[in-house]
A protein has these predicted regions:
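Polytopic transmembrane helical bundles with strong interfacial aromatic enrichment
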Residues: 1-249
Length: 249
């Protein structure tokens, strides 16, 4: 068997995943805090004020990475859910459900920071703009997945039902991504592009990319931590799980 496939196969074992998550979750959190400190320092003290928005634009160094992550985490959740439904892989069920509260947090941060930025720029805390409205619907989808997963007593059936909802909700992602281009919108178009020329000066973009990296690291740490907790809960009757949780046998 291919070494990479063999590693993934072994990782599907609950005890192996527990050891992996216990080792690497703190690393993800540590790297996330370090890169976030660097990114925030650059955003607050190094980058000059915007010539149109003044210092108000600095909140975008939190808003933009959070918005990107709200979409990324949902897409990843749907992928895990699809794998779990097709191949009945328990670890993917756990990972999919662990994504939901993290993605909901990123979406809530996106909406909150967008409102804070919108008040001085648009003169209102909220507008039923296509981008804002679709992002709010995304938050409701996350909450729906969380609620459905919690409402069904059987853990595997709960994960499958919530995973199906997550897969159905994927159709919203392109709506959020292209809403500014498809409809008249107050929301500004993309100023930072992975491919193509960005409208923001390069001297102002490096803290943003550092913050994007910070959210990735933090997400990885949080995903591993939440998945490990769910894994231990499901395997609570096993000796290895008792030992890992520090409980007496």
């Amino acid at each position: 068997m291919n070494p990479v496939l063999l590693w993934f196969h072994q990782l599907g074992s609950p005890p192996t995943f527990d050891r992996f998550a216990a080792r690497w979750a703190p690393v993800g959190f540590g790297l996330g805090l370090l890169t976030m400190a660097i990114g925030l320092y650059g955003a607050l003290f190094v980058v000059p004020a915007d010539y149109q928005q003044g210092d108000s634009f600095r909140i975008l160094y939190i808003h933009v990475p959070a918005a990107w992550m709200s979409l990324f985490v949902y897409a990843l959740m749907a992928v895990y859910a699809a794998i779990a439904l097709i191949w009945r892989i328990k670890l993917c069920e756990i990972l999919a459900m662990a994504c939901a509260p993290i993605g909901a947090l990123f979406t809530a941060v996106t909406l909150a920071t967008g409102s804070i930025w919108g008040k001085p720029m648009w003169g209102t805390w909220w507008d039923w703009d296509p981008r804002l409205t679709s992002e709010l619907v995304l938050l409701f989808l996350y909450l729906g997945v969380i609620g459905l997963n919690a409402a069904i007593e059987d853990r595997r059936n709960a994960a499958r039902a919530a995973g199906f909802l997550a897969i159905v909700g994927v159709v919203l992602l392109p709506v959020i991504r292209y809403s500014v281009e498809w409809w008249n919108s107050l929301h500004q178009g993309a100023t930072i592009k992975l491919f193509g020329e960005s409208t923001m000066d390069s001297s102002m973009t490096w803290p943003l990319w550092v913050m994007v990296l910070a959210t990735k690291f933090w997400f990885a740490g949080s995903l591993l931590q939440r998945s490990r907790a769910d894994n231990l809960e499901r395997e609570a009757g096993k000796d290895w799980a008792r030992a890992a949780a520090g409980a007496p046998r």
